[in-house]
Amino acid sequence: MKYGNLMMTKKKLLIGMVTISGIVILGSCGKTETVNELLIVDQCNDVRDLCRLELANAQVSRYTNFLGKTIKRLQSQTPLRDIQGTVTWNASAGTSLADNSDVQSELGLSCQDDNCTANSNSTAYTLPVGSNTISVSGTVTVDGKTIDLATDVPALVINTSAAGSSVHVFPTELEGNLTLQDLVDSLNQGRHYAHATFSADGSNLKIQCDPGYVWLDDINPEYGGQSSAASARSVAMVSWVEELEEFRVDEFRFLHFDMSSLTLNGVRLGNHVFWEMGCWPT
């Protein structure tokens, strides 16, 4: 009996050693090579809505494992100077070439010849919230080799976050029998569409954005005014009907499902006063 147990133990150890040896052998069955590639290198601010872009000569190591998966690691990069040929930058809709003074003040850098253009290397773009694709095209000669940039240089995807905060306070100048608490209660009926909670902050109206949502810093309408953002989001919308001295929410509920770029803070249209508010996804 003891002999049988001993043989089983030896067999398990042998299987374990074979398995471990197999893993070591498979793990070593890979190939590593170092190559030079042209890449787009970006330097951006915190929310990535301003990015400087440069075409660089990069040294990249490629490791291909036994499963055929390739892992790339950037070893070094050198900006291309005195390019022979033409570089043309291509950016997705909504982007625009940046002002070099903004690049200097925010990033401490500059575009080529202090001018950010579609043909300079480096250049810079201002980017809208969301996913932005930057690519490069043209034909250049590097170290005697002619390169088709559109084919050989992979596009770069930059995800831009909304610049904002989780809380915003609106001034109010409510009149008649309209109370701040009534306004808060009415807006909170649509809080799930606004992705926020409304409350009173002294005599002002406060919006607290849900996690994953922000209020854009540059959207700050005075009472009776409105602001328009570059991007839309879902909103809560209510109106105060003066002759009835009551809020109406349901008749405007269809607007909750619309994507609106407007923010209304007590905008008067005839005998109605409107509020339209909602936070933006980060």
UniProtKB/Swiss-Prot annotation:
Subcellular location: Cell membrane
Protein name: Bacterial lipoprotein FTN_1103
Pfam assignment, any one: DUF3281
Topological category with respect to the lipid bilayer: Lipid-anchor
Induction of expression: During infection of mouse bone marrow-derived macrophages (BMDM) expression decreases when the bacteria is expected to be in the phagosome. Disruption of genes for cas9 or either of its associated tracrRNA or scaRNA increases transcript levels about 100-fold both in culture and in mouse BMDM.
Deletion consequences: Significantly decreases interleukin-6 (Il6) production in a Tlr2-dependent fashion by C57BL/6 mouse BMDM.
Signal peptide: 1-28
Stated role: Stimulates the host immune inflammatory signaling system allowing the host to combat the bacteria. Stimulates mouse interleukin-6 (Il6) production.
Lipidation (S-diacylglycerol cysteine): 29
Keyword check for ATP-binding: no
Residues where lipid is bound covalently (N-palmitoyl cysteine): 29
Keyword flag RNA-binding: no
Keywords of this entry: Cell membrane, Lipoprotein, Membrane, Palmitate, Signal, Virulence
